[in-house]
Regions:
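Substrate-binding groove of N-acetylhexosamine-processing glycoside hydrolases
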Residues: 1-327
Length: 327
């Protein structure tokens, strides 16, 4: 057996056979390695902080700028996913652990040069389904929780909303929602996941669509369909919220969902026509996007930056494209 302790135990007289478990980060881990101690990294892998899989995938116990010698680097044993459980229940624990920890596992057993996030997410989607086949409830429980919140009405509009929002990150939930032993953990924030699949797909399509300038045809139909769905779902959620008190806290998000859909459709229309919008539209749109960027019910839209990119492209219609340097 090996004794393992957090960073704080690293004192001058500490025996070298004790392993340092670093929550402080790679710098603290490297310091221990230089002093001859073996170490494990947890910083970057705290899954209770609700960071997306891409965040964890970018965290390496031996980062590219590491100055450890090859011999010192051997003292870095790897990493460990960690989770404090104040905000989890039997209904939500699987969605808070899986499938992100599969991405962490791949990060830890892969060379540092493996960094293709898009391909990671492609494969993670397959792994997620395989985990469900094994009996994990990270996917199934979400729909169950949404049905309960909707009082067994059609949850399609709620699913649309949840696909583009994520719980606030790190410790912001504590700041926005003081917790007691009686705090319910059955809200939309608990049904939402750290990786909003719809938001990720939308962001990727916007990038490809804008790269297709000046034609703006690539993924235009798909983006138009998704934005229209946001508009329709936002409108449909209003009556549902009126009938379900448990959903009242997300009412500002329904307006935001509709307006994000509206703004995105209008921006695409300007790009399609090749006509820049009027200044009044730009000013009104800025106000809508600023409002949509605010968190409500400890949830935040993950699509606001991509919609802003559409708006900016529309505003810049007719302007000279920025030159890129080959240097």
């Amino acid at each position: 057996k090996k004794m393992i302790g957090w960073d704080e135990i690293l004192q001058p007289e500490l025996p070298k056979d004790i392993v340092i478990h670093s929550w402080r980060g790679t710098a603290a881990l490297a310091e221990a390695a230089r002093k001859g101690y073996y170490g494990i990294l947890s910083n970057g892998y705290y899954i209770d902080l609700i960071q997306p899989a891409s965040h964890h995938y970018a965290s390496d116990p031996l980062p590219a700028d590491s100055t450890l010698t090859p011999e010192q680097a051997k003292h870095v044993l790897g990493g460990e996913a960690t989770m404090w459980a104040e905000w989890v229940t039997p209904e939500t624990i699987d969605s808070r652990i899986w499938p992100r920890t599969a991405a962490i596992a791949e990060r830890l057993w892969s060379p540092r040069t493996v960094t293709d996030v898009n391909d990671m997410y492609r494969r993670l989607g397959i792994i997620s389904l395989q985990l469900e086949e094994l009996g994990l409830m990270h996917k199934r429980n979400q729909d169950m929780m949404l049905r309960r919140l909707a009082r067994h009405e059609d949850i399609g509009p709620l699913q649309t909303l949840v696909s583009v929002v994520e719980p606030v990150k790190e410790y912001r939930r504590y700041q926005m929602r003081p917790q007691t032993m009686l705090s319910p953990l059955t809200g939309v924030i608990d049904a939402a996941t750290p990786d909003a699949e719809g938001a990720r797909r939308f962001t990727w399509m916007v990038k490809e669509f804008l790269a297709d300038a000046p034609r703006y045809q690539l993924y235009r139909a798909e983006l138009t369909q998704m934005l229209s769905e946001w508009q329709e779902s936002g409108a449909a959620l209003g009556p549902m919220i009126d009938r379900s008190p448990a959903l009242k806290e997300i009412k500002p998000l329904t307006k935001g969902l509709s307006e994000l859909g509206e703004v995105g459709l209008e921006a695409i229309s300007y790009l399609k026509l090749g006509q820049p919008p009027a200044r009044e539209w730009r000013e009104a749109t800025t106000l809508k996007l600023d409002e949509a960027a605010k968190p409500y019910a400890a949830l935040e839209f993950m699509v606001v930056p991509a919609v802003k990119q559409l708006v900016q492209a529309a505003v810049e219609i007719g302007q000279p494209r920025r030159a890129t340097s080959s240097m």
